[in-house]
């Protein structure tokens, strides 16, 4: 079977030769207009203990954010995973914070996955090939985070045909080109998009201007029949400006990544993968003021650089024993704050000393598989050096599972993880302008987790998965005021954490209908200075459901309706409850160190209608979506207002439309 274009297939069926017939004796031929092969895959598939893969094909039917497809919105549907605030692109897993989830984009660490202040992620739906999350057993090949591993992979270009696609959304424009470099030997892929809400803001006579762009590229080439080389790049940037009378303020942030990978097949039992990468994150803030002969310009930047490499070998020692082993290295440099200013022509520079972290790791995993049994036993040994201290970590990991038959299995796992990085929240919740720093005071963060789960096929089309977990964390750094921390260059306040919960996911599949529903009960706590309190993203009850139905399904044409519903408990919140005057007598509002209340429960319903049609030279697709169709007001923050309090709502009702045209076979 050869794929020609999304939604259309060319089927080549070999004929079995049973007799010889002269060609000139064949009286006629029959041409079949089309052959339709239909099958539905579940939205999410459990691969092993606590590890879930997302079906990227379903992404094109999901409701759009401002006309954009976002894989992170799918990942946030997973049980045990939360976005944090409404509309955010965070991945908070099993009582962990966003910085405790390792996000890899083609094996390159990503330090800021947000566009549009977190409403969208940096991963374009046009380029993503696969997305997997590990929140139970994590391969020893990966470490440096406490909670989870998320791997996003970019698809390769087509090796036989050149293709082009153009997508016009409500506030965005995207284009993708891919095709062969040399037929059946190599391919290229380049994709770019631009988000331009400033057009709407200008019509509304708003002083705020905002937009973002990103570019993704990938080259793949078989330098030998057993060796494939690939080069991947990504660059993206967000910018926002606000003009008022004599002043102008701006924010911005961006990622740049590059990776070079060599995959080799040495023989039937040995394969290897070597990747070298670079990742860069910069956040910036800029102010301008000019009035009555006084002028002021200032710019503050925060930067994170990382160079790294990883070598992995997969070796089959026998029909029941597979070995995975290798090494990893990284060098990170953090520039926490550098300020340039010009005041009435006088130049001033101020910066804090940069910090660095050098990390190395060796890892080994033994996989045994016999009958229905499967066992993984591995260990990761890591060393971290921050120029002042060197710390070592040994992380054993193990899992055991038994498969009773198709879609019926049980599993048990235990993991130990360590982390040497800390993400600063410039405010008391995660924002794209946060920055990173290495461990201090000789303390690495540590966590251990045990989980037990199973999957059962209740009916031909109905599957239920259930998993429970218990996790402990220690040496968690708590920072209440990042500016004071930078000024004093001091240490952290440390605490401990505990989380447990049970996760359930129900999936129902027919030829036309796909339903995935998940429920999570969890209890996440933190303890510091003798006080135990709810984790700021603790959500005791969390329910998500995604359903898609093919309203029209016939050769060359498909209409799909989809609905996504989310309900969860309100988040704990640190209420501003006191104020004190500054030197000019203006009130400064204080924020408590611990949550003192919970916000209202969260609810959101998103709907979408997708119309896809195959053309002679490609595919045409229209998609209409409404985010928060019920216009439910979900607060993201609370602030004092005239002796009382008001809530800030980020996501109102958001209708959008998207048109995609694909050309090529």
Describe the predicted segments one by one.
Residues 318-322, 328, 351-472, 518, ...:
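Structural signature of Gram-negative outer-membrane beta-barrels, strongest in the C-terminal barrel
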């Amino acid at each position: 079977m050869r794929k020609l274009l999304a939604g259309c297939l060319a089927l080549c069926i070999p004929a079995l030769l049973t007799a010889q017939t002269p060609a000139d004796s064949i009286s006629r031929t029959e041409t079949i207009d089309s052959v339709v092969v239909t099958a539905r895959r579940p939205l999410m598939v459990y691969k092993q203990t606590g590890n879930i893969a997302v079906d990227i094909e379903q992404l094109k039917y999901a409701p759009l954010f401002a006309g954009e497809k976002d894989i992170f919105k799918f990942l946030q549907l997973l049980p045990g995973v939360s976005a944090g605030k409404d509309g955010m692109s965070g991945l908070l897993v099993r009582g962990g914070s966003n910085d405790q989830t390792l996000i890899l984009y083609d094996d390159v660490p990503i330090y800021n996955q947000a566009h549009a202040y977190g409403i969208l992620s940096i991963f374009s739906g046009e380029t993503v090939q696969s997305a997997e999350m590990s929140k139970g057993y994590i391969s020893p090949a990966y470490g440096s985070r406490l909670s989870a591993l998320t791997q996003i992979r970019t698809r390769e270009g087509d090796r036989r045909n050149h293709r082009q696609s153009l997508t016009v959304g409500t506030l965005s424009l995207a284009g993708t080109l891919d095709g062969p470099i040399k037929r059946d030997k190599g391919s290229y892929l380049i994709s770019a998009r631009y988000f331009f809400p400033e057009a709407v803001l200008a019509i509304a006579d708003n002083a705020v201007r905002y937009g973002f762009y990103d570019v993704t590229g990938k080259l793949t080439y078989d330098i030998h029949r057993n060796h494939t080389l690939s080069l991947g790049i990504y660059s993206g940037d967000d910018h926002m400006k606000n003009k008022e009378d004599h002043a102008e303020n701006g924010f911005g942030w961006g990622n740049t990544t590059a990776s070079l990978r060599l995959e080799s097949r040495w023989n039937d039992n040995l394969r290897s993968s070597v990747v070298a990468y670079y990742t860069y994150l910069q956040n910036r803030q800029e102010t301008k003021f000019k009035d009555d002969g006084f002028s002021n310009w200032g710019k503050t930047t925060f930067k994170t650089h990382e160079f790294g490499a990883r070598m992995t070998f997969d070796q089959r020692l026998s029909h029941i024993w597979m070995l995975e082993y290798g090494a990893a290295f990284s060098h990170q440099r953090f520039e926490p704050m550098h300020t340039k200013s010009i005041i009435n022509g006088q130049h001033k520079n101020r910066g804090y000393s940069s910090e660095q972290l050098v990390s190395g790791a060796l890892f080994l995993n033994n996989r045994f598989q016999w009958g229905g049994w499967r066992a993984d036993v591995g260990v990761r040994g890591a060393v971290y050096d921050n120029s002042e201290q060197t710390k070592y970590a040994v992380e054993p990991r193990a899992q055991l599972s038994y498969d009773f038959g198709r879609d019926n299995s049980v599993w048990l796992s235990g993991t130990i993880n360590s982390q040497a990085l800390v993400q600063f929240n410039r405010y008391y919740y995660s924002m794209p302008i946060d920055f990173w720093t290495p461990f201090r005071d000789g303390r690495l963060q540590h966590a251990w987790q045990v989980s037990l789960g199973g999957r059962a096929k209740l009916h031909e089309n109905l599957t239920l998965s259930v998993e429970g977990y218990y996790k402990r964390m220690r040496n968690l750094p708590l920072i209440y005021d990042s500016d004071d921390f930078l000024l004093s260059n001091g240490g952290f306040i440390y605490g401990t954490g505990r989380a447990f919960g049970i996760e359930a996911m129900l999936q129902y599949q027919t030829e036309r209908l796909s339903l995935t529903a998940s429920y999570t009960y969890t209890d996440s706590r933190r303890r510091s200075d003798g006080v135990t309190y709810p984790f700021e993203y603790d959500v005791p009850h969390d329910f998500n459901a995604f359903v898609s139905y093919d309203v029209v399904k016939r050769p060359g044409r498909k209409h799909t309706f989809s609905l996504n519903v989310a309900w969860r408990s309100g988040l704990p919140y640190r209420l501003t409850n006191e104020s004190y005057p500054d030197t000019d007598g203006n009130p400064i509002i204080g924020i408590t160190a611990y949550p003192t209340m919970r916000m209202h429960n969260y609810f959101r319903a998103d709907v979408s209608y997708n119309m896809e049609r195959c053309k002679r030279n490609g595919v045409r697709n229209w998609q209409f979506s409404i985010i928060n169709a019920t216009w439910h007001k979900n607060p993201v923050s609370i602030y004092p207002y005239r002796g009382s309090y008001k809530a800030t709502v980020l996501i109102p009702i958001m209708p959008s439309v998207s048109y995609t045209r694909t050309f090529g076979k």
